Every structure is written in structure tokens, then in C-alpha cells.
């Protein structure tokens, strides 16, 4: 299977999971060149009992790996850091059941990422050159 076929298969497998509101494939899979696994970022409906507990991502990863025969790393965007959210949501959107929720989520976290990233860069510059 090529990358397009793999992404479509993952999309189809996620399609029957109403607890997943939106999902992205990111990492080496969406970049030019070879890949060893699929990085999948999901945003889930926290009110669904199915997603409560620490093993949801592991179970989803195992299910996907069985079907597509490629290792799949699943992260839950609901609990991720702003930098992980920023990187993941620059990837390939493969599922989107709520555009407004997705855009609001991304807007909030990208803003926090850029605000925080700016402060980090200031501190790095200060450390390199001493405080003035």
C-alpha cells in the first residue's frame, strides 16, 4: 500500500468510532521520504465511557496495527502539550466530525504555543548573551 491508501484505510477504520471527534496523521508519514510507523493524534469526546481510562490509546493502536500491518503510535490531543498539539495539527487531517470544535481547539493551543515559544526564545537569547 502507498501512503494515500494507508491514510484512507486509517480514515475508514476511524470512521466507525464516534468517540473520535477529529484525527491527524503526522510525523514522518506525512513528510517526504520513508516512514517506519504512523503517528496518529486524536481528539476524543471525554464524555464517552469508552475513552475513559489509560488504555484507550493502546487498544486503538493495537486494533489499527492489526488491520494495516504498520506500527501506529496514538496520542490523545485532549491531554497533550501545546507543542505536541502544534506539531500534530500541522499534519494530515483524516477525520473531522466537528469543525467548530477543531478550529477553536487549534486556535487556543497554537496561540499558547506561539506565546510560550516567544518567551522561550527570549530566555535562550538572554542565556547566550547574558542579561542586559
Label each residue range with its predicted role:
Residues 41-45:
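Short hydrophobic/aromatic beta-strand micro-patches
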Residues 1-22, 30-34, 49-132:
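Catalytic core of pol beta-like nucleotidyltransferases
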